[in-house]
From Swiss-Prot:
Sections of the chain in a coiled coil: none
Protein's organism: Synechococcus sp. (strain ATCC 27144 / PCC 6301 / SAUG 1402/1) (Anacystis nidulans)
The family this protein is said to belong to: Belongs to the thioester dehydratase family. FabZ subfamily.
InterPro entries: FabA_FabZ, FabZ, HotDog_dom_sf
PANTHER family for the chain: 3-HYDROXYACYL-[ACYL-CARRIER-PROTEIN] DEHYDRATASE (PTHR30272:SF1)
GO-annotated biological processes: fatty acid biosynthetic process; lipid A biosynthetic process
Residue positions of the active site: 61
Recorded superkingdom: Bacteria
Molecular function as annotated in GO: (3R)-hydroxyacyl-[acyl-carrier-protein] dehydratase activity
Subcellular location: Cytoplasm
Record's protein name: 3-hydroxyacyl-[acyl-carrier-protein] dehydratase FabZ
Gene that specifies this protein: fabZ
Enzyme Commission code: 4.2.1.59
Cellular compartments per GO CC: cytoplasm; membrane
């Protein structure tokens, strides 16, 4: 399998945050992946998100009992999936956004101090503009969240 010639060259793993920023458009406070630790072109990727107390969402979600919002866990899974899609062979460059979020389940709370291990597996890619991934978020070997995420290319 070849890598998209227009995409940045894939350096040696792990991919640091600076490399991830070269692949994804997200920036603070929505850059939610700190490192990519595993990557198989066109198939899967595994990333790390270190959850810290000084993140802005914890000011209001919830005072005295901070919990990472589920929507941000889903977004973090999607960003790991975005690494797969961005580096896929023959995939046009552009902005991929959510087209669907299916069968998402939250199994345990994610709190400051946790390390999310985010895995994304490519399920399908259609017409060079739609991709579906299966995402999982784990903390200490326990499933925190999972679901299917669908992306669409915005022109």
């Amino acid at each position: 399998m070849t890598v998209n010639p227009d995409a940045p060259a894939l350096p040696t793993l792990p991919l640091a945050v600076e490399t991830i920023q070269g692949l994804l458009p997200h920036r603070y406070p929505f850059a939610l992946v700190d490192r990519i630790i595993d990557y198989v072109p066109g198939e899967r990727a595994v990333g790390i998100k270190n959850v810290t107390f000084n993140e802005p969402q914890f000011q209001g979600h919830f005072p005295g009992r901070p919990l990472m919002p589920g929507v941000l866990i889903v977004e973090a899974m999607a960003q790991v999936g975005g690494v797969i899609v961005t580096l896929m062979p023959d995939m046009p460059q552009g902005l991929f956004v959510f087209a669907g979020i299916d069968q998402v389940r939250f199994r345990r709370p994610v709190v400051p101090g946790d390390q999310l291990v985010l895995s994304a597996q490519l399920l399908s890619a259609k017409r060079r503009r739609f991709c579906k991934i299966q995402g999982e978020a784990m903390v200490d070997g326990q499933l925190a969240a999972s679901g299917e995420l669908v992306f669409s290319l915005v022109e």
